[in-house]
């Protein structure tokens, strides 16, 4: 099951990784007082597919006075007034990085991917580090030291060391959560020097559902249910 962004970020937060502050808005709901002090905003449609930016479903707001128009444009593009929206803090970004862990099915192992730039078509870039990770090998204090020399050619030395420590945590998260893919794109290096996961693509193995709380990822489950055809629903039931 692919997770909606809001659920994917909740998973990251549960494992101690920083994500932007955000508020989930359902049909008819507006911004809360909590958002008033944020320095800027993004309004994002919560879907189970990619390509939202190209479809006009992610909008940058300079202030909350732009919220109504942004919501109207997003919902009109979807032709669906019930789509949940994520209102999120705009993080001050100094640099964007790509980091992911996925199952390499051909070799029956995990693969850690890192690139010095985020954005589209990262996996076609020559500047992409690919690091094999044994499925049954949990991270140890030595793991960042194995990642560092592979990525050091792409980043300043101090940043490479910090990023190696950050990336070393992802395979363990993937194992614990039964993930087929955990992609953070972009991972923002903020102007204050912090790492913040600004977007997350997360796919979990459906066959592992029995190991997890059925209440987890409620938005993703609702969206998946809405997307099912009558035949798919009948086959499931």
Regions found by a protein language model. Name each.
Residues 1-184, 188-237:
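ATP-dependent carboxylate/acyl-activation modules
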